[in-house]
Amino acid sequence: MKSDALRIVVVVTALIVTWFLPGMARGTEGGGSNKALGVETVLTGVMPPPGMAFNTFVGNYSASETLDGDGNPRKGISNFSIDATGMLLRLQYVWPDAKLWGGDIETRIGQSLYADINLAFDVQTPGGKIHRSGKANGAFPAGLFAPLLLGWHGERVHQTAGIEFFYPTRAYDKAKLVNISTGYSSIVPAYWITWFPKDGIEVTGTLVYLYNLKNSATNYQSGQEISFDYGLGYALAPAWQIGANGFLYQQVTDDKLNGSAVPGGNRGRAVSIGPFIRYHPSKDFGITLKWQHESLVENRARGNRIFLQFRMPL
């Protein structure tokens, strides 16, 4: 059962980073990822106008169960509880009068400002049940840099594409039960699209592929991942929008430890859906509140998340 306990450590250490990188648990090391799940669901294909804009994300994730590769409660683990909260700031600069291949040019940087994780669970051992718990919190656990993104604007379809780079900005301590850093970097090709099929209706999608580098502290390399954030919105009034949002997530290659695939591959999977409401008194300013519930989960915790997002020009 010790291996199960260690797997739970892996399922938690990077949870918070999943939320608050412009990003919560999955297969991979730490059960997390360096790219947000379920964050980019509103107007993501629409590159801001020339100049500086910023987005702030505040979120909470909570779960009371962790599942195995068959989607069943993990054997030997009981009374599981995880609560994670974090905040991210993302700056976007669109270069005035600059074009490449017909698209506008954006440079993007992001920084997780704060993360707080509380974890507890019981492990069944031959000698009886053992309670484990841990917490971690601190500032600036991870960062994002995208030197060149391209954005194209049409009458009803807006698209953005490019490569983002995610990296830890806090040390990873393999001796700790919980870390706020994943301990590894990721290279992430990404494509964002927003379509307005009719006035007052928005369809948004964000497709990303993550190639994860090795965590030098543990010699563990998380498998490659693909995720799709989605949103379908309806304008109740000029400044108010409601709709459904969520994500589809699948890890597509096995995790590796010391260069060899871990038993079973530890591939994560999850789907989420939930409602959102958005207030946007102008085209450049908006506040979005959304909730998502996870299902069809494998090799990760299953829970709920809440996001509060702000977008405005500087």
At which residue positions do the language-model features occur?
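Surface-exposed strand-loop-strand hairpins of Gram-negative outer-membrane beta-barrel proteins
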Residues: 28-33, 61-86, 122-136, 177
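Sequence/structural signature of outer-membrane beta-barrel proteins
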Residues: 63-65, 114-120, 153, 166-177, ...
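Extracellular loop and loop/strand-boundary signature of outer-membrane beta-barrel proteins
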Residues: 41-42, 73-79, 128-135, 173-179, ...
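Short loop/turn motifs that connect adjacent beta-strands in outer-membrane beta-barrel proteins
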Residues: 26-30, 43-51, 95-105, 152-159, ...
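Outer membrane beta-barrel transmembrane domains
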Residues: 31, 73-74, 216-314
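Residues that define the transmembrane beta-barrel architecture of outer-membrane proteins
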Residues: 81-89, 103, 137-144, 181-187, ...
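Transmembrane beta-barrel strands of outer-membrane/channel proteins
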Residues: 35, 54-62, 107-113, 161-167, ...
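Residues on the lipid-exposed face of transmembrane beta-strands in outer-membrane beta-barrel proteins
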Residues: 44, 56, 89-93, 145-150, ...
